Amino acid sequence: SSDLRFAYNLLEVCYYSVSDKKITLDIVKSINNTPNIFHDKDGDNYYDLLSAFQKSIRGSDVQASLYYLARLLEGGELEAICRRLQVIVYEDIGLANSSMGPKVVSACIAAREVGMPEATIILGTIIIEMALSPKSNSGESAIYNAINTVKNNGSYPVPSHIKKNNPAYKYPHNYKNSIVKQEYLPKELKGSKFYIPRENTFENKLKIIMENLEKINK
């Protein structure tokens, strides 16, 4: 029932609002008197907030990102926030700022360890950096390009020279710069490109590396 969900949400907010995790009647009364912070996890509003949160970060709107973070924090959604942030950093920031991945994971670990209210500072700080970071979804696009190829074409045979214990395999570390001309894709997919770099500083460097490697294998 809605009453049961409300009680559960209230208890969850109380739990994350006290550092020693000791919930008293006074704490429950205090949190319960805070207006308009709860949302029904089974209703549209909960998922609308999570959607708005991610889209604000993706859209590089730092003010909106902080606002929706505050809404979710006040609703006791620490776990949901941390899960969503770890998706966002790889889905929407990705290779445009690859150092953000470990930063976000570390921030989420720290937020969970210290709990509320101190987690607010940790998450607020990392959200600002995420929102203002350059963005790229090339990693997401690349893996789904590969998945769609598998779904649409089935499984082609692995080239014999890279099968296990095949003497025809050329061990790259035995060659200059650990690079040797050798085909790795099935012959039916030769020349396929799943990863298409976006225009940003880091991926421009990756593009040059990739193009140089492709020249070697021509």
Please name every model-derived segment:
Residues 16-39, 80-85, 142-147, 160:
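Conserved C-terminal helix/linker of AAA+ ATPases
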Residues 35-41, 45-57:
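Active-site flanking loop/helix segments enriched in acidic
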